[in-house]
């Protein structure tokens, strides 16, 4: 099953690259490594390579996206995460807009402690040239976890580097998470970008019956890799 999935992912990636060059869509592939794979700032996998595919298309003013990530878990059971999303921005003032997004993601966790589950979410952000506040509603169907994330982020460029610091607080049915993040990226050749993210994550669980994370985490998470945009 895992071999067939890897072959399918390779074929899909090749088809996406050809399709993106001949159609008005955006597409990207990336590969890297993470010390902890996070979903809503909860640890779903440890010390894993990550390969991803993203495809986007704008139609009638709405941005549609398809995203997938694949992790070969060390235990031998692979993990994959696939999502569909749609978003639209509404201009309020010349340099101020409201961004609304909604999506659904299927998480094949590859972990005995965390069952496979489907997440439905919706996000609203107040986009501007300064700080961007946002709120995201979350509902995990099989895990029976629901709640919201509130956060604020800032995006800016300096000396050819792109920076995106963010602070988040997430409240779910049985968990609270606090996160401080810094993402950095830089174009290194043509359509090839290098990226990294460092985050401090602190979890606070209100139950000992944990089925939504590997463990209650308090520490640093590092992620890095390369991304090719078509």
Q: Whereabouts are the PLM-identified features?
A:
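Solvent-exposed loop/turn segments connecting transmembrane beta-strands
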Residues: 39-47, 71-81, 107-117, 138-148, ...
């Amino acid at each position: 099953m895992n071999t067939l999935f890897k072959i399918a992912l390779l074929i899909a990636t090749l088809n996406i690259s050809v399709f993106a060059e001949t159609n008005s869509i955006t597409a990207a592939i990336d590969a890297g490594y993470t010390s902890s794979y996070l979903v809503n700032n909860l640890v779903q996998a440890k010390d894993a390579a990550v390969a991803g595919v993203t495809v986007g298309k704008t139609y009638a003013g709405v941005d549609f996206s398809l995203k997938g990530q694949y992790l070969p878990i060390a235990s031998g059971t692979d993990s994959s995460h696939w999502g569909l999303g749609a978003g639209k921005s509404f201009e309020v003032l010349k340099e101020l807009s409201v961004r609304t997004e909604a999506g659904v993601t299927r998480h094949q966790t590859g972990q005995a402690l965390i069952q496979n589950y489907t997440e439905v979410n919706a996000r609203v952000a107040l986009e501007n040239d300064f700080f961007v506040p946002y709120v995201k509603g979350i509902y995990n169907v099989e895990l029976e976890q629901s709640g919201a994330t509130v956060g604020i982020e800032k995006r800016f460029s300096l000396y050819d580097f792109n920076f995106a610091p963010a602070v988040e607080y997430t409240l779910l049915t049985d968990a609270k998470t606090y996160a401080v993040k810094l993402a950095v990226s830089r174009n290194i050749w043509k359509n090839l970008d290098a990226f990294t993210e460092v985050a401090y994550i602190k979890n606070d669980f209100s139950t000992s019956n944990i089925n939504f994370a590997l463990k209650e985490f308090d520490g640093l998470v590092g992620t890095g890799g390369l991304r090719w945009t078509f």
